[in-house]
Amino acid sequence: MLIAIDVGNTNIKFAICTSNRILKIIRIASQQAKTADQYFFYLNNIINQLNTDFKNINNIIISSVVPSITKPMLELSKNYFNINPIILDNNHADIFNIKINLQNKALGSDRLADIIAASNIYPNKDLLIIGMGTATVFNLLNKDKCIYGQVIAPGAHILAKSMRQFTALLPEVSVSKQDKVVHNNIYHAMESGVYWGYITMVNGMIEKIIKEEKKDLHVIATGGNSYLFFDHKTAINNIETDLTIKGILYLHNMLSNNTAQNSI
């Protein structure tokens, strides 16, 4: 069994997986780094819920874009599971014949995991993969599995927090779905601005990218804010909320030469 760990700027995901199935995922906030012992407390809860044994865990793969949290995750793996974990990085793209044609190969490990999963789930397609996390990252992958371009924009939570941070009187609001656009109180007006502003930004960016690329792009959304698009008919073809974890699982199977690769 695999423990897949996705460390993002806003949340950490712990997932317990078999070779072809994600059994359980929990999310915790990542704003403040914790100790290996504290992270084990959360992970131990999942293992107990699944009624499985620690001995069944034979691999741990970590995708992390927060260096300060990577260290306790390494300690967690070694101290509690006696496993030297695999740290997902750009070198793993070669295993899947994925080429990174970006300056300085500037691609986060979470986004690479997304691309690994998307290229396996939707093969032989020109893909636009949108990671809707702390930042909103649009990555382009062609049929030849070359990552050749990207757009990076603020995430919905950054939009919400920035209004409070850079103004004297505006309150802090949450990111939440809104049925209407115009409101008569400041809280709902701000929530509407964040929600509909984010929806409009993403839809507009997709439209501009497709127009500029002049090709039929299969559009996939993933990440913590992708749920905002569940009720909207947009150019997004598929919403894959756990694409990063699936990418880590594909890597696990590839490194293990596991025949379950195509059934995730």
From Swiss-Prot:
Binding residues for substrate: G108, S109, D110, R111
Signal peptide as annotated in the record: none
Coiled coil: none
Localization in the cell: Cytoplasm
Catalytic activity, reaction form: (R)-pantothenate + ATP = (R)-4'-phosphopantothenate + ADP + H(+)
Chain sites annotated for binding ATP: D6, V7, G8, N9, T10, N11, I12, K13, T134
Catalytic residues in the record: D110
GO molecular function annotation: ATP binding; pantothenate kinase activity
Superkingdom field: Bacteria
Cofactor binding, note field: A monovalent cation. Ammonium or potassium.
GO cellular component: cytoplasm
Free-text function comment from the UniProt entry: Catalyzes the phosphorylation of pantothenate (Pan), the first step in CoA biosynthesis.
Name listed for the protein in its UniProt record: Type III pantothenate kinase
Source organism (scientific name): Ehrlichia canis (strain Jake)
Gene this chain is encoded by: coaX
